[in-house]
């Protein structure tokens, strides 16, 4: 990596992952993932924030989570057989996102299993942190 270029993350494994990704800037309020889409792309938030939403039976939007810089989304299809996406993901403001197709991810996993292990550790830490935040929020809501 060029010494004059600032890394996108403080985590070396993430920077290596990002070197394989397509990076794009996405405007505010843009739907990145639609429920019903094929699950075929993994995303990483370089900057900005997104909201993960579903629709209830009456068609009302329900926000499941807010994800921020340094978090992945769209990963469920990598680990579970899902024919389609089950939620929408929309940017809350302008975001810089890294994208990698599942086939490309699997190719890199075969070529660099160490990198994938490091990323899996980051993903597990991120999911654990999100779960802890959700647990705290649920407790506050039910006081």
For each of these PLM feature ranges, what is it?
Residues 32-37:
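Short phosphate-coordinating micro-motif centered on Lys-Gly-acidic
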Residues 50-62:
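A short beta-strand-loop-beta hairpin characteristic of the jelly-roll/cupin
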Residues 21, 39-40:
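Short loop/turn microsegments at loop-to-beta-strand junctions
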Residues 18, 22, 121-124, 128:
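Amphipathic, well-packed alpha-helical segments that form the structural scaffold of globular domains
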Residues 1-31, 77-78, 111:
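Cyclic nucleotide-binding regulatory module and flanking cytosolic helices
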Residues 130-142:
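Short, Lys/Arg-enriched, Trp-marked, Pro/Gly-tolerant hinge/linker segments that flank
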Residues 65-121, 128:
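Cyclic-nucleotide recognition modules
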Residues 29, 40-53, 69-70:
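Glycine- and acidic-residue-biased ligand/ion/polar-headgroup-sensing regions
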